[in-house]
Amino acid sequence: MAETEALSKLREDFRMQNKSVFILGASGETGRVLLKEILEQGLFSKVTLIGRRKLTFDEEAYKNVNQEVVDFEKLDDYASAFQGHDVGFCCLGTTRGKAGAEGFVRVDRDYVLKSAELAKAGGCKHFNLLSSKGADKSSKFLYLQVKGEVEAKVEELKFDRYSVFRPGVLLCDRQESRPGEWLVRKFFGSLPESWASGHSVPVVTVVRAMLNNVVRPRDKQMELLENKAIHDLGKAHGSLKP
């Protein structure tokens, strides 16, 4: 096999497969950018958003996006929303500050895991999980512990392909006001790129890494992409290593 493969050809080959995709968490910053990039690249024949409320879009490009409104507290009642998708992207997440400790665990672990279970039962072959740098189920920090726990639990479901993305601090213009995160982003933005890139990453780079990864054939059932790999893959243009 050639050392690299043309990205344009990989994308075209992928489009020819007429695959369908769902996105969990499309109302959040990463999910929103992911949806935009998916539509711009035209990789999937059907795009479905699964969320607790219907989102409104003004742009013509969004007119064919399907939406499934679910109650995450009663996901078993909405199993049909997870049926018939080849690929799934999970960008669900909240913060302890916003939802409290119990609410954070419920969203970032319980909702994610239940959604993955229903997706697997519904025929999803490739599940993509947005996690976090430092995720570790043995961590003493709740945030990293929960992220590590859900990574491991989803792996046990044995998707045909399971991709975990562990970005550092996400650099973006977040829709909701979080002064602490804003200060962190300003801090990383002022640092030399070589240092900042080891601990942070623009949301658009994460999203492009996800999509560049999904189009390249892989033999591994489970793959873990840390922050550096996300940078490398997200910035790839002409070719990709298989």
From Swiss-Prot:
Tell me if Disulfide bond is a UniProt keyword of this record.
Answer: yes
Biological-process GO terms, alphabetical: angiogenesis; apoptotic process; cell differentiation; import into nucleus; positive regulation of programmed cell death; positive regulation of transcription by RNA polymerase II
Q: Which GO terms describe its molecular function?
A: oxidoreductase activity; protein serine/threonine kinase activity
Taxonomic superkingdom: Eukaryota
What the entry lists under InterPro entries is as follows: NAD(P)-bd_dom, NAD(P)-bd_dom_sf
Record localization: Cytoplasm
- One Pfam match: NAD_binding_10
User: Active site located where?
Assistant: Y143, K147
Q: Where is this region: Required for interaction with elongation factor EEF1A1?
A: 2-25
Task: Tell me the residues on which N-acetylalanine occurs.
Answer: A2
Cite the binding residues for NADPH: S27, G28, E29, T30, R52, R53, L92, G93, Y143, K147, L170, R178
GO cellular component: a single term: nuclear envelope
- General function of this protein: Represses translation by preventing reactivation of elongation factor eEF1A. May also inhibit nuclear import by competing with nuclear import substrates for binding to a subset of nuclear transport receptors. Has additionally been proposed to act as a redox sensor involved in cellular oxidative stress surveillance.
Q: What is this protein called?
A: Protein HTATIP2
* Species: Gorilla gorilla gorilla (Western lowland gorilla)
Q: From the UniProt record, report the name of the gene that encodes this protein.
A: HTATIP2
